[in-house]
């Protein structure tokens, strides 16, 4: 991915210099395999400074429609700056739970929707998963740094009809028990 990201002090970024590209490329590959619609209802939850939104724009063009949601106002401002050239990009500074509550009040997402979710180590949690089930996006890409939280969050999704299309794991912290997992789910 040929894109530069600016980060404020204290903003989250992967420690290894190649990790962000590795994860972004995998997310883009999964989106392509799912039949990602750049003009669909697309959301990048816990979107940080806009890594995955930027990667999707690099792959699908600057007309991409995507909303990046991030609780940290500083990171959301960074995302707004990092995605300024993407015509359909929005950056929302809200906790994901509150954003999804508002979004769910408008009914289900359209059939061309994709949601990328990259929660903190604790996972998305039941409230977010319940809202995603209510919104029923056609495609989900879940990026996780804790396999226990991931399995807890995947259980209700798969019980509700989501099928795991692909799972990829990355050892970004050699000689530790930590690894990143990316899961592609389709309904």
Where are the model-predicted features located?
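Rossmann-like S-adenosyl-L-methionine
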Residues: 1-187
């Amino acid at each position: 991915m040929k894109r530069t990201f600016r980060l404020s002090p204290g903003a989250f970024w992967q420690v290894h210099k190649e990790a962000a590209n590795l994860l972004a490329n995998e997310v883009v590959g999964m989106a392509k395999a799912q039949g990602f619609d750049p003009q669909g209802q697309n959301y990048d939850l816990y979107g940080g400074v806009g890594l995955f939104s930027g990667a999707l724009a690099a792959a699908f063009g600057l007309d991409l429609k995507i909303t990046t949601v991030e609780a940290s106002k500083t990171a959301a401002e960074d995302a707004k700056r990092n995605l300024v050239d993407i015509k359909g990009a929005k950056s929302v500074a809200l906790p994901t739970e509150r954003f999804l509550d508002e979004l769910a009040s408008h009914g289900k997402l359209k059939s061309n929707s994709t949601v990328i979710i990259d929660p903190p180590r604790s996972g998305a949690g039941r409230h977010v998963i319940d809202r995603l089930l209510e919104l029923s996006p056609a495609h989900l890409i879940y990026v996780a740094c804790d396999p226990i939280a991931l399995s807890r969050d995947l259980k209700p999704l798969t019980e509700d009809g989501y099928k795991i299309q692909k799972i990829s794991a990355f050892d970004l912290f050699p000689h530790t028990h930590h690894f990143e997992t990316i899961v592609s789910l389709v309904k």
